[in-house]
Amino acid sequence: MTPLVLLIIIGAYLLGSISSAVLISRLYRLPDPRDSGSGNPGATNVLRLGGKSAASMVLVCDVLKGMLPVWLSYFLNINPFLLGIIGIAACLGHIYPIFFHFRGGKGVATALGALAPIGWDLSGMLIGTWLLTVFITGYSSLGSLITALAAPLLTWFVKPEYTMAVSMLSCLIVLRHHDNLRRLFEGKETKIWQKISRKAKLK
């Protein structure tokens, strides 16, 4: 590992540590997403708390946190395995942000951003998988889990040399959703539509 790669890994973690959900919630005068709603500082929870505008900004920022360092590394011809490490560093920053007392999100949008440099076709398939799952089941967490599990297989069809790197990212996302997985098995996970409608009734 070269000093440049090490510097990019550190930079990816620090960039990932910028919690856009918390900052944008402050900008919109919304409750802290770490202490409200699902307690997850991510776009889905901000959608429940503040609506589409704030959630869209959070989503874009979270995607960019993963995309920028990996895209830079991609154009520097850094090998696929190290690209995976850089993507994981960005996701770990999002999940355990040093600037926000290590209270972060699930890392789904940041992981999607990290996968984007592999190809827009792969990104489209992953987004489609998530949307279809959420549309059918209503569970955002299940959409994330199924998309994470499908990502290595889809990558193998598109660019097989990146399968190992994507598999590492997928494992991180699945592990981060262990609480959601337990609630799904227990039938206690709340559907995203129920949470949004509940918020609307409170207004």
From Swiss-Prot:
Write down the EC number: 2.3.1.275
UniProt keyword Cell inner membrane, yes or no:
yes
**SMART domains per UniProt:** G3P_acyltransf
Q: What InterPro entries does the annotation carry? A: G3P_acylTferase_PlsY
| Record's subcellular location | Cell inner membrane
The principal localisation class reads membrane
Citing just one GO molecular function, the answer is: acyl-phosphate glycerol-3-phosphate acyltransferase activity
Q: Name one GO biological process term.
A: phospholipid biosynthetic process
Task: Please give the HAMAP family that the UniProt record associates with this protein.
Answer: PlsY
Q: Its function?
A: Catalyzes the transfer of an acyl group from acyl-phosphate (acyl-PO(4)) to glycerol-3-phosphate (G3P) to form lysophosphatidic acid (LPA). This enzyme utilizes acyl-phosphate as fatty acyl donor, but not acyl-CoA or acyl-ACP.
Q: What is this protein called?
A: Glycerol-3-phosphate acyltransferase
Protein source organism: Photobacterium profundum (strain SS9)
Q: Which gene encodes it?
A: plsY
